[in-house]
Every structure is written in C-alpha cells, then in structure tokens.
Curated annotation (Swiss-Prot):
The lineage of its organism: Bacteria, Pseudomonadati, Spirochaetota, Spirochaetia, Spirochaetales. Belongs to the MnmG family. GO terms for cellular component: cytosol. Its main location: cytoplasm. This is tRNA uridine 5-carboxymethylaminomethyl modification enzyme MnmG. GO terms for molecular function: flavin adenine dinucleotide binding. One of its GO terms (biological process) is tRNA wobble uridine modification. The gene is mnmG. Pfam families: GIDA, GIDA_C_1st, SAM_GIDA_C. Homodimer. Heterotetramer of two MnmE and two MnmG subunits. Keywords: Cytoplasm, FAD, Flavoprotein, NAD, tRNA processing. InterPro entries: FAD/NAD-bd_sf, GIDA_C_N, MnmG, MnmG-rel, MnmG-rel_CS, MnmG_C, MnmG_C_subdom, MnmG_C_subdom_sf. Its cofactor is FAD. It comes from Treponema denticola (strain ATCC 35405 / DSM 14222 / CIP 103919 / JCM 8153 / KCTC 15104).
Amino acid sequence: MYRFSDYDVIVVGAGHAGIEAALASARMGEAVLLITQTLDSAGRLSCNPSIGGISKGNIVREIDALGGEMGKLADASMIQYRLLNKSRGPAVQAPRVQADKFLYSQLAKHAIELEKNLHVFQDTVIDIVSSNTNESGYVEKGSVQYVKTERGREFSAKAVVLATGTFMEGKIYIGEYESPDGRLGERAAIGLGPALAKKGFTVGRLKTGTPMRILRRSFDSSLTEEQEADEIMRPFSFSNAEIHRPYAKCYITHTNQETHDIIRENLHRAALFSGKITGTGARYCPSIEDKIKKFPERDRHHVYIEPEGLNTEELYINGLSSSLPEDVQDRMIRTIPCFKDVIITRPAYAVDYAYVSPIQLSSDLQTRRIEGLFLAGQINGTSGYEEAGGQGIIAGINAALFSRSLKFKDEKYVPFVLKRDEAYIGVMIDDLVTQGVDEPYRMFTARAEYRLNLRHDTADERLTERAYQIGLQTKEASNRLKEKLLTREKIISLWKDIKITRDLIAKNPELKNHIGKSLADALHDPQVSLECICAIDENSKDYSAELLESAELEIRYEHYIAVQNRKIAKVKRMENTKIPADFDYDAVSGLSTESRTRLKEVRPETIGQASRIRGIRPSDIMLLSILL
C-alpha cells in the first residue's frame, strides 16, 4: 500500500450527497479529497430528470440557503418549471423542474473542478480503517484513520464522509438477468459493505428502480395530453433573480387493460417477484408490476413522458419502472397507443444495494461506533436526489467542524444540527436517526409538524445567517437576506398605512366588505387577491413577484404562524433537555423493558428526540424528564 498525504476530509462518492458534502467542507476551508469511480458521472440524475417536488423543492432551497450547489445546478439546467399545489395553501406548495440531465452533471463536475480546496481521485474505496479494531475487524469506539482503495492506495484524513448511493454492493436486475452494477453499465463498489458489517455496523439491503428510456421519434405525441407547466421559470437559488432557459414539453398518457394483462401473465419473470431481489423497495415509488399486483381493480395508471435534455432524443417514461425481462417490457409498452412503434434505448431495471441502519448515527450524521465517520444519502436508507443533497451538506459541514476541532485544540467540536422547526432537512435527519428505516425514506410535507414555518420561500430566512456564521455562506448572501427582510417590512408597513375608501372599492369590488380597513387587514380575507392589492399600491411595480408574495403570506398567515410558534415554544423544553451520551438506562428503576431496549439502541440526544422513538411509552418519557 502507498500512503498519500493527509487530508482534512475525505468524501467517498460524487453523487448528490457527495457533491454537497465535498463542496461544503472545502468552502469552509478544509483540505478535501473526493474519491469517486469516475468524475464524469458526478451529479448524475440516475432516474427521473427532475429536481424538486412536494417538500423536496423545500429541501433544495434549504441546501441553497446553506450555501450548497443543488439549487444553482437546477437553475442552470432547467427546461421546465412548475409550482406544485398552487391551489392549496403555501405550506404544501413547492417548486419542481425538469432538468437537462447531461447539462446538470456537466455543471456539477465543473463546480467540483473549480473548488480550490478540493482534490479528486478516481478509484473505488473498499475499507475505512479506524483505531480500536480487533483481530476480527470489529470496532469498539474507534476513530477514523485512513481509507483503502481498490488499486492499493491509502489516504489519511481527520474525517470521512461516505456517500455511496446505490453503488455499495449494488446489483441490477432485468428479469432473469442480474449484474453487479450501481447503475446499468456502471460497476458496483464491492467490498465496503462487508467491511462495515465486520466493524459492527448493522448493514441491510434496499431496492429502487428506474423505467425504460425511448427514442423521441418513435413516440406519437399527438396521442397524448400535454402536461401543463408554468409560463415563467422561477429560480431555486436565492442568488438568482430570474431564469431564462429554453422550454421543453412533457406529456401524459395511461396504461390500459391489455398492458396489465401482459404484466400479470409475466409476474413470475419479474425479479421483484421471483425471489432474486432481497432489498425492500419504497411503497411510494412502486414498479408497474407492483402497481398491477397491489391495485388489481384499477384499469389504468398514469404514465408521464419527460425529456432527458435539450440535446438528446431520449425520453424518460415516468410510471413504468420495472424489473420485468426486456421482451415483456417491449410488449407491454407497445400496448399504449402513443408507443405503438416505440424504440427502447435503455431497458427499465431494478437495483438493490447495501445501506447502513441510520439509528447508528447521531444528529450530525456521525456514526457512534467510529468517531469522524459521517454517512450521507442512500447509504442511510433514503430515496431521492434532494434527500441525499440535504444530508450531504450537513455531513460536509460537520466533517469540516470536526476536522477543525482536531487541528485547533482551542476550537471545540459543536455539531451543526437543524431542528424539526428549522428545516425539512432537520425533520428528515431526526426521523432517520430516531426511528430508522424499513424501506427507502422519502420526504413528505406530512412528516413536518411545523410545515407552515418551513415554506420554500423562507429557507434563506431560516438558514442563511446560520451558514454565514460557520463560514459556508457568503457576505453577499447575508446582505441579500437583510435587504429582502427590510424591503418586505417596508411593503407590509405601506399596506398597513393605505386605507380602503369608497373610491377604491368602485375600481376593486372584491374590497367591498373592507371599507376603512387597511390593505394589510383586507389580505386576511381569502377572497382578496394579491393582484387586487398591487392594483391599488402603485409602488408594487418596483418589487419582484417573489417579494410581494412573501409580504402577502406574512400578513395572510400571521395568526396561524403565531399559533405554530407558540406550539414550538411549548416543546422547546423537551428539545433542549439533553441526555448524556453515556447515560445508563439500566440504572433507571421503573423503565419498561421495551423502552430501555429502544433507548439503548437509538441513544437519543434529547428528551424530545426520545419521545419520537417508536415503542417508547409516555410514562417512560415522563420518568426520564424527572431524572434529567
């Protein structure tokens, strides 16, 4: 083995988690090494060529507010924009874009190459070496020392972030065919999963999948419905004022009874049902054969046709993820009229891979078994680019802070942790480390109890100053936030001062019930639109649509936000009551056996976190509260 020079932080994997982790650590001034099999695959949109969605779009904006890259990459590569749930309340609205997958990956690679504190080495990591390792490889409270690669290199570091995606012991399935790949045609990283298990980590397997891709010219769009999109593209990144990009169309069609019959006749040939796949899949992203089996009463399922980019003729067939053999895939898709003469360029396939149970992590995404080892992304049992990116930036921040604490003895390691009332990222990580996973974890607005406070448009208000304080965000971003808040307050003050007169009602009849009130008061009426307010306030033309909408929401929902803030304040005491890392649960008399077992397994950091562990009795939480 040849030992290379020391680094502060090593990041393994250049997917969405690895990119954010590596860039965050490097931008905080640490010397970072990113190890990946091939840099050309950096930031690959392996499945759906889209970024964002319900709650996922909020995470992208949170990553950006923290100083991450995903929002900027999405802005620079978007080819369609939609604000989802526009007809519903702001707490569940979120942006989603179609992205040019090749441009996105190219820009991600370039961002990595431009970062001055970041080096890249293209190889496969097969082991993490730590202190306190016995002869059998088991580790009891060790510390990271170095990583080993497949080609015999060793790299030392103070902290290591593992962001392996579907590549750790990955295997793809197409009917009877199987291959040790992380993606079709890209070999898996073999060796690291068993190495982690040998050290004492609980390692399992999860499953995901992707649909076929087809050639555009073999598809008849006239037999489909065009999917509506927003006319104006809006940015994810708070650093971008507006977006001007070419637009691409998406389409909707449906399966039919003939499609379903072919699938039913061949279920025994699907890897998902033949016993080949051992990993558990996400119930919220089922394969087409899973849909047919679970919902036999349905006579059709939606299929979305989405472009993979502006300079490719391949289309992504959203809704037809499958592990069926290629001959069955070809027959089933041709039963849909618009695909009668289809040419499949890449088959659908399933992939299962190794993951590490996340209840073995602390809230900073550091493993409790090996100090200085952080995990992010699908290795923690999550699904989705956005979830991976959100974990990646937190792992990268904490790896940098941990490294600093070892370099500078007067700098104590204080983990950067986002709470459930601060960010969707905080909700996700708390769910992972407190409850673990038994299927790929996907973020939903329903998981967040304080979602009105976690709107996508407020991500900068919640997170930018915190990121600036640790050296990740820029002074420019901090100043931009201050300017936004000052301007919004100015708009709100103006609307509070403008009174509604009879003359104004003549031109704006929707204000007829608000004579004598201010424009701000009128906004509490759901029948009064922002457009009506702006028609009266001539100064509104000087402000961006985003800023005006932000002012509107602050006024319209101020009472609901106040109620939510009171609820947050009530639970703060439990969230702030720390449980010592070495707390002896066996010494607590009266604690139920089930609660004692779960508490010892999860090792919650606060009483609040303990209360969210599955199987913990309220009486046991009360007992711990009294003791602490």
